[in-house]
Amino acid sequence: MNAEIIAVGTELLLGQIANTNAQFLSEKLASIGINVYYHTVVGDNNKRLQKAIEAAEERADILIFTGGLGPTKDDLTKETIATSLDEELVYDEKALALISNYFKRTGREFTENNKKQALVLNGATVFANDHGMAPGMGVNKNEKVYILLPGPPKEMKPMYVSYVEPFLRNFTTGENIYSRVLRFFGIGESQLEVKVQDLIDGQTNPTIAPLANDGEVTLRLTAKHQNVSEAEKLIQHVEDLILERVGEFFYGYDQEFLHYKAIELLKRKGLTLACAESLTGGLFGNQVTENAGVSSVFKGGVICYHNDVKQHVLRVPEEVLHTDGAVSKECARYLAENVKDVLKADIGISFTGVAGPDASEQKEPGTVFVGLSIKDEPTVVFPLNLSGSRQQIRERTAKYGFYHLYKKLEEI
């Protein structure tokens, strides 16, 4: 079955809040075999909402609305749908009692407009709001399914999980959708696509969807099957074919981000890390500390932005700074080796370069050096030539640091 998600609220069109509900619902619907082909956003306007309903009825089996169930005059979703379906709005006694009790407990006046939140379409399946007041509802009419949900994510998400998904499963074929995301770094999207183009062209079940995001490339493999284990087998076969070709750039699955993978490997190896950050200005260390329990492996870092700090704290020779420059292979090497020694760590990693927008030391923006010094191993410096805005260059540099750290740890 096909679904359309219609988000109602002028605040969405004004950009005052992000439509995170659509992302959540799309992912959940896909997992039970319901395809989402359209996302629509419409303001708090009866006529425009009616047009959106008519358009959705032409192209979707399931219409899911978020927002517009509240007590104010511009909350008009259920009124508009009631008119469209020629159905009455009636009070749901459980919801009415819940709202009434809330106002009694808080000592506030229970006004007529607040009663409005307890109105539901006559004959609808009512979804209790365990985290708010306005209930949701589901209606099956004219060979279409209409789902009305509250707008606040803290109310909508638990309502969907507890009540809406079981309701929707009555209308599905029982076919499950199973997805797995393969994460790659160090290879561009176009280069990766060339390597697996024949697999993409021949995709049926599972499908392969590439996506580039800030220096990384992901491949989402999606299979449909009534049996989850059979869907997993379909995906595993395609994954094996992909990794035969580009496995050297693969580092993880789904939400396994680079910084998480690198820190987990540090923990398993029982090694400690220190960082010297010039270009990145603390970005790398910040991402390190996003991982729980990282104090067991992270000694700390030095933000050595000024050359005085490079020279006097991390002992980069003055001659290197004058001759090679702060943005150089030699400087990166000294920074990595000396931060390791100063902070008594097993591994030192360093970042120096030009973030832009202007050149520095006659070196163009995007000129970057990442140093990596591991005890009992020769120091390695990775030169990079990155593009993008100042912030993008800094963020991508930190990612390259995690990538090279992860790959080096795999070899030890």
UniProtKB/Swiss-Prot annotation:
Family of the protein in this entry: Belongs to the CinA family.
Per the UniProt record, the lineage of the source organism begins with:
Bacteria, Bacillati, Bacillota, Bacilli, Bacillales
Its recorded name reads Putative competence-damage inducible protein
Q: What residue intervals traverse the membrane?
A: none
A Pfam family in this protein? Answer: CinA_KH
Task: Tell me the superkingdom of the source.
Answer: Bacteria
Looking up InterPro entries in the UniProt record yields: CinA, CinA-like_C, CinA_C, CinA_KH, Competence-induced_CinA, MoaB/Mog-like_dom_sf, MoaB/Mog_dom
SMART domains registered for this protein in UniProt? MoCF_biosynth
